């Protein structure tokens, strides 16, 4: 819950790399949750996890960041099905 008592959604992505801008995997389910919850969805990026005090980068509304051009999404195997699922 945030300071106003509203539910927030947090996805933690950790890496041994110190580079917070390094690409990471995000599942379709995680991406759909980010779309659904927008400003209440956060990605916590933990870098340099082998260090004594790994830094944590907090990103709110990753979908908004994409739309503003402040993030990018690489879709190497995106598949879409239109119409009714059988």
Residue ranges and their predicted role:
Residues 2-4, 50:
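Short acidic-glycine loop/turn motifs at beta-strand connectors
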Residues 1, 8-16:
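Conserved catalytic cores of phosphodiester-cleaving nucleases, focusing on short active-site segments
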Residues 7, 21, 38-41:
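Active-site lining segments that contact anionic ligands and/or coordinate catalytic metals
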Residues 17-36:
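Mg2+/Mn2+-dependent nuclease catalytic core
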Residues 12-14, 28, 48:
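Residues immediately flanking
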Residues 35-86:
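Domain-level recognition of nuclease-like catalytic cores that cleave nucleotide substrates
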């Amino acid at each position: 819950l945030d300071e106003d008592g509203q539910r927030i959604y947090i996805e933690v992505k950790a890496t041994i790399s110190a580079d917070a801008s390094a690409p990471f995997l995000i599942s379709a389910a995680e991406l759909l949750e980010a779309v659904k919850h927008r400003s209440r969805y956060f990605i916590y990026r933990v870098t340099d996890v082998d260090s004594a005090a790994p830094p944590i980068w907090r990103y709110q509304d990753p979908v908004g960041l994409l739309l503003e051009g402040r993030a990018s999404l690489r879709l190497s195997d995106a598949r879409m099905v239109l119409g009714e699922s059988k």
